Amino acid sequence: MEQRKGLAGLFLVISLLQGTVAQTNKAKNLVQVDGSRGDGSVLLTCGLTDKTIKWLKDGSIISPLNATKNTWNLGNNAKDPRGTYQCQGAKETSNPLQVYYRMCENCIELNIGTISGFIFAEVISIFFLALGVYLIAGQDGVRQSRASDKQTLLQNEQLYQPLKDREYDQYSHLQGNQLRKK
């Protein structure tokens, strides 16, 4: 049993190493992404040295035929420039690069100011909540007079009524539709 586990582990290690070696032997990535521009635009840069470079998006040409620029502006990142991009020269084609922007319309940037604002607002709200509980719990309730404790509200005879015997009314029997036996 132990030999099988060892053999399976050895097979897994060898297959992972082969995948790593195969990945390093591939052509280097020639397309670079610059998404940290001040205006919010996304810029692709091709590492080919050819004079004419064609840009491909999802396999179709998106650049003019005689384009000589090695950069391609995808536009604003708010327009969601998704797709698989490649640059193609006369002799060589780059590896495909998949661009995907996760658009978050309701996100906030977490920095020290935002976090401290959240903490400050939380402390203030807890303070006001505790103050409200203290003021409400600290109030004296309306005290009833002791005279009502000494009065008998109902006479003893009025508390209970005996069941009517030998009548077949709705409440003269205990279960379901069974009538009381005589």
UniProtKB/Swiss-Prot annotation:
Positions carrying Phosphoserine: S145, S148
InterPro entries membership: CD3_esu/gsu/dsu, Ig-like_dom_sf, Ig-like_fold, Ig_4, Ig_sub2, Phos_immunorcpt_sig_ITAM
Disulfide cross-links: C46-C87
Described function: Part of the TCR-CD3 complex present on T-lymphocyte cell surface that plays an essential role in adaptive immune response. When antigen presenting cells (APCs) activate T-cell receptor (TCR), TCR-mediated signals are transmitted across the cell membrane by the CD3 chains CD3D, CD3E, CD3G and CD3Z. All CD3 chains contain immunoreceptor tyrosine-based activation motifs (ITAMs) in their cytoplasmic domain. Upon TCR engagement, these motifs become phosphorylated by Src family protein tyrosine kinases LCK and FYN, resulting in the activation of downstream signaling pathways.
GO BP terms, alphabetized: adaptive immune response; cell surface receptor signaling pathway; establishment or maintenance of cell polarity; protein transport; regulation of lymphocyte apoptotic process
UniProt subcellular location: Membrane
Ranges for domain Ig-like: 37-94
Assigned GO CC terms: alpha-beta T cell receptor complex; cytosol
Glycan-carrying positions: N66
Topological domain ranges for the Cytoplasmic compartment: 138-182
Quaternary structure and interacting proteins, as annotated: The TCR-CD3 complex is composed of a CD3D/CD3E and a CD3G/CD3E heterodimers that preferentially associate with TCRalpha and TCRbeta, respectively, to form TCRalpha/CD3E/CD3G and TCRbeta/CD3G/CD3E trimers. In turn, the hexamer interacts with CD3Z homodimer to form the TCR-CD3 complex. Alternatively, TCRalpha and TCRbeta can be replaced by TCRgamma and TCRdelta.
Ranges that cross the membrane: 117-137
Protein name (record): T-cell surface glycoprotein CD3 gamma chain
Topology within the bilayer: Single-pass type I membrane protein
Keyword vocabulary terms for this entry: Adaptive immunity, Disulfide bond, Glycoprotein, Immunity, Immunoglobulin domain, Membrane, Phosphoprotein, Receptor, Signal, Transmembrane, Transmembrane helix
The ITAM domain, residue ranges: 149-177
Posttranslational mods: Phosphorylated on Tyr residues after T-cell receptor triggering by LCK in association with CD4/CD8. Phosphorylated also by PKC; leading to the TCR complex down-regulation.
Signal peptide extent: 1-22
